[in-house]
Structure formats: C-alpha cells, structure tokens
C-alpha cells in the first residue's frame, strides 16, 4: 500500500512551499513554518491539558483554539509571501486579531499581581506548559523575523506585532492559571 503521507520528495533535503517554489529544509521560510508548527502543537497540548483539568467551559480553552486557527493564516502568509496562490489564502493577521490578543492578555493580567523578578519555575504542569508555549512563541518570532529579513518586499507589521505579543500572552496565561489555584510561580531569589 502506498502511503498518503510519505512521498519521498523531501529525501534530498528540499521541500515545496505553498507557492510551489522548492526550498532547502533549512531555508528561513521552512524554519519559520516549522517553528510555527511546533507552536501550534504546543498550543494544542496546552488546550487539551486545560480541558482535562477544567471540565466545562473555560474561556482560555476557546481562545487557544482561536489562536490555533490564526496560526494557519500566518503559515499561509509565510508559505506564499508573494501571493502566487491566492486560492489557498484564507486571509492574514489583521489589526482586530492583534487587538483581541491584547484584550485577552489584559483581561488575564488585570486579575494578577505579577512578581517583580524573573520566574524560575511554574508551580504545576499546566502553567509549565504555558511557559513552554511562550518559549515556542519566542522561537517562532525569531524565525519569523529572520524570514522577513531574507524575503525582499515581505513586510507584515501587524503580523509581526501579533507574533511578538504571543509569548507575553502565554507567560501571563501561565501566571493566571497558577493564581487561580492560589499558587504563585517560583520567583528568582535575590543574589
């Protein structure tokens, strides 16, 4: 039986982008798409952990699903930077997406008294997963910037701002999840 997943076309170290062009798997575009996929998977894991720990409706669960859908908008923007395949594009990150992300972070942060020092460790698995997701968001941001710098005429300031806010959101979400159980993250001790 022939696999529907394995094609063997990437065995030489190249892969095709959405726009049809072939790139090395270490090209800035592929690095950006790959780290975005990692962010998507970590966001999904966090969402599933929240569903398991908080049966019923928790607004954060729905918001994480919303973010996951937006990751696909970002991915198609990166994979087709010159819009050669508009039929595959479902839109792009707009100001209203950025505002919704900022509003959600502000909602969570308004209920917190954040520590004045660096966080050494989360206090439970779900908050730790939020921290891992924040790290993935920062990694993706670096790859997105590298791709932007390597791609002439690719300038997406709203998308870049959105990507920049993601790690802040996940950090605040982690602290919010700890606060909701009366726990606080382990802050760095003074030297």
Mark where each language-model region is.
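Phosphate/pyrophosphate-binding loop motifs in nucleotide- or prenyl diphosphate-using proteins
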Residues: 1-191
């Amino acid at each position: 039986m022939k696999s529907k997943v394995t094609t063997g076309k990437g065995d030489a170290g190249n892969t095709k982008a959405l726009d049809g062009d072939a790139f090395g798997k270490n090209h800035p575009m592929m690095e950006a798409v790959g780290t975005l996929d990692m962010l998507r998977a970590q966001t999904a894991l966090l969402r599933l952990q929240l569903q398991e720990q908080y049966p019923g409706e928790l607004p954060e669960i729905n918001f994480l699903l919303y973010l996951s859908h937006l990751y696909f908008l970002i991915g198609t923007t990166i994979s087709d930077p010159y819009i050669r395949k508009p039929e595959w594009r479902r839109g792009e990150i707009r100001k209203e997406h950025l505002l919704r992300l900022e509003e959600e972070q502000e909602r969570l942060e308004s209920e917190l008294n954040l520590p004045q020092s660096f966080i050494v460790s989360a206090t439970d698995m779900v908050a730790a997963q939020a921290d891992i997701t924040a790290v993935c968001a920062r990694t993706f941001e670096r790859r997105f910037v590298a791709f932007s710098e390597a791609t002439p005429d690719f300038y997406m300031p709203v998308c870049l701002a959105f990507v920049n806010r993601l790690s802040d959101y996940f950090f605040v979400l982690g602290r919010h999840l700890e606060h909701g159980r009366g726990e606080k993250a382990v802050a760095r001790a003074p030297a």
